[in-house]
Amino acid sequence: MHETEIAAIEAREILDSRGRPTVEAEVILSCGAFGLAQVPSGASTGSFEAHELRDGDAQRYGGKGVLTAVTNIKDHIQPELVGLNALDQADIDQTMIDLDGSTNKSKLGANAILAVSLATAKAASEVLNLELYRYLGGPLANLLPVPLMNVINGGAHANNNVDIQEFMIVPHGADSFKEALRWGAEVFASLSQVLAAQNLLTGVGDEGGYAPNLASNQAALELLVEAIEKAGYQPGAQISLALDVAASEFYKDGQYTYDGAAHSPKELIDYLDGLASKYPIVSIEDPLHEEDWESWGNLTAQLGDRVQLVGDDLFVTNPIRLQKGIEQQSANSILIKLNQIGTLTETLETIDLAKRNSFTSIISHRSGETEDTTIADLAVATRAGQIKTGSLCRSERVAKYNRLLRIEDELGSQASYAGAVGLGPG
């Protein structure tokens, strides 16, 4: 047996950061090297995402158990992969895709397939004695991403009256990732003081951002500008803002309901254009419904030369959806979530397609996260230049930032911060 062959695969049901079950897999090679991976789970999910398999047994975890996915790994995936070379990631992933046989990984579960896919890459990097980012990215894996830090939550991520799902700070003006992280943490602390001074709640949402009850979406933007200035930084020049509108969540029958009233797509486009003119907004994610391709094209024509327009629910990390966006000139950026497509190989192919067509890529977490830090390595490996992994609190978020600090340290003088070399947003 060759030392890089897969000898066994373990799997178990664990908990994510919301206390809901998710899948963990361990791929063990014949030489004893192993890789461990946990998969995340989203709250606002796009309709076209790969299928997350849940048990549906109301007696366990309200039907959200993942024992079926775990069993699929042990009984179906393991027998097919044992004996295969862990260094051939594409072969491993294709074997699982073929075994599943469905268009959206609904037979075995994208959560089962992804856990094994990521654990395989980690086992392979260990047997080669390489860090994961170096194994996946080769000698050019030295670009640290600009973080888009979600510090105020609304929409589906919080129980408040703010329509926009995420308000982010983007410290692109820093010289290093370490400095960018410090800036973000200082603004987050400053925001806490600004909220407290206005008697607003400082409890946090799923991704560690504050979820105060605010009068409007503009009120959130005003708070962020104030917090940035209070921390001693310049809004726009050093730290900009980004939004995740998650517009599919407040879309019905061709209308968008926000600020207490229904609006047409054109009105929403003009509304966002107005916000981007008034505030230092460099990136807007999911500004329109995931099937409103025409409006996406109109928005991109109107705003695309000034603002990064990011497709998340629109593209769901799917190369076929992305190709349509490229052809129709809908958006100019894609959010990358491993569990939307379900294998590492397909994720890398989607990032490559984006890059070849001058779309930016943002590597992203999900609202239900784990201590797994794969996305930090993926951001560096692919030179994406941007990462979305939540706020500056909750250890499942901070784990990714801390991993990036270690990578930057390890790279030493070779490390380059995307914001400092003009490869981030802003």
Curated annotation (Swiss-Prot):
A GO cellular-component term linked to this record: extracellular region
A Gene Ontology molecular function term of the record: phosphopyruvate hydratase activity
Cofactor note: Binds a second Mg(2+) ion via substrate during catalysis.
Top EC category: lyase
Catalytic activity line of the entry: (2R)-2-phosphoglycerate = phosphoenolpyruvate + H2O
Family of this protein: Belongs to the enolase family.
Protein name: Enolase
Organism: Acaryochloris marina (strain MBIC 11017)
